[in-house]
């Protein structure tokens, strides 16, 4: 890309980005930029970030919708969970470790990319697709349904904490 200069008229006005996409997209762009290299800025980048943000929000909404009848005081113990739910918690712990280290190193772009990958690949494309039957078809007191809800609750709670510093809408 070309360098942006106000005199060339090829700059991107943050107020325009804010008005078109909202503050969260502007924050997400700033957090997802690798400041060790030239920071890219374009309508296409903001469009992609908007799509990623929508996927993140939809994933969180799906999890929240499936926790309506869930009591956080009755979490399923990991040793009582099916392998798939324990696998998700392992992946979640890996994400936590990566995010904690990235926060310590001020590498916010690593966090945004890791959370996006986790939401799109680990959750949406794999885990949530498999556990839908447990969530929709099993009884409210089913042990396997409660196990899936426990995994969703812990995941949603963690994602909101991981992104609270970056996105206002995920403030815990």
Where are these regions (language model features)?
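Long, charged, mostly alpha-helical binding arms that flank functional sites
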Residues: 2-167
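Conserved small/polar residues in nucleotide/adenosyl-binding loops
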Residues: 169-172
């Amino acid at each position: 890309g070309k360098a942006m200069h106000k005199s060339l008229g090829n700059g991107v006005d943050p107020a325009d980005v804010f008005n078109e996409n909202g503050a969260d997209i502007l924050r997400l762009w700033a957090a997802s930029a690798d400041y060790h290299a030239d920071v890219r800025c374009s309508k296409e980048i903001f469009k992609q970030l908007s799509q990623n943000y929508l996927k993140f929000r939809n994933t969180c909404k799906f999890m929240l919708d499936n926790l309506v009848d869930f009591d956080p005081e009755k979490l399923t113990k990991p040793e009582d969970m099916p392998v798939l739910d324990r696998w998700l918690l392992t992946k979640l712990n890996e994400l936590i470790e990566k995010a904690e280290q990235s926060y310590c190193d001020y590498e916010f772009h690593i966090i945004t990319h890791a959370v996006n990958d986790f939401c799109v690949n680990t959750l949406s494309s794999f885990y949530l697709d498999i556990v839908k039957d447990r969530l929709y078809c099993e009884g409210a007191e089913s042990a396997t349904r409660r196990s899936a809800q426990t995994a969703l609750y812990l995941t949603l709670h963690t994602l909101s904490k991981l992104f609270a510093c970056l996105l206002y809408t995920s403030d815990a």
